[in-house]
């Protein structure tokens, strides 16, 4: 149970980082093409 919750937290953090990276890239992309 503890391991499962830890894995869930890690996966959630990973998806959050991915989303943040995507938005940052989008920002850079927009700034680069304006």
Curated annotation (Swiss-Prot):
GO terms for molecular function: DNA binding; DNA-binding transcription factor activity. Its main location: nucleus. One of its GO terms (cellular component) is nucleus. GO terms for biological process: artery development; calcium ion import; diaphragm contraction; endoplasmic reticulum unfolded protein response; ER overload response; gene expression; intrinsic apoptotic signaling pathway in response to endoplasmic reticulum stress; negative regulation of fat cell differentiation. The keyword Cytoplasm applies. Keywords: Cytoplasm, Nucleus. It is found in: Nucleus; Cytoplasm. It comes from the Eukaryota. This is DDIT3 upstream open reading frame protein. It comes from Homo sapiens (Human).
């Amino acid at each position: 149970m503890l391991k499962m919750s830890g894995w869930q937290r890690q996966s959630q953090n990973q998806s959050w980082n991915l989303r943040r990276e995507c938005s940052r890239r989008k920002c850079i992309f927009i700034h680069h093409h304006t």
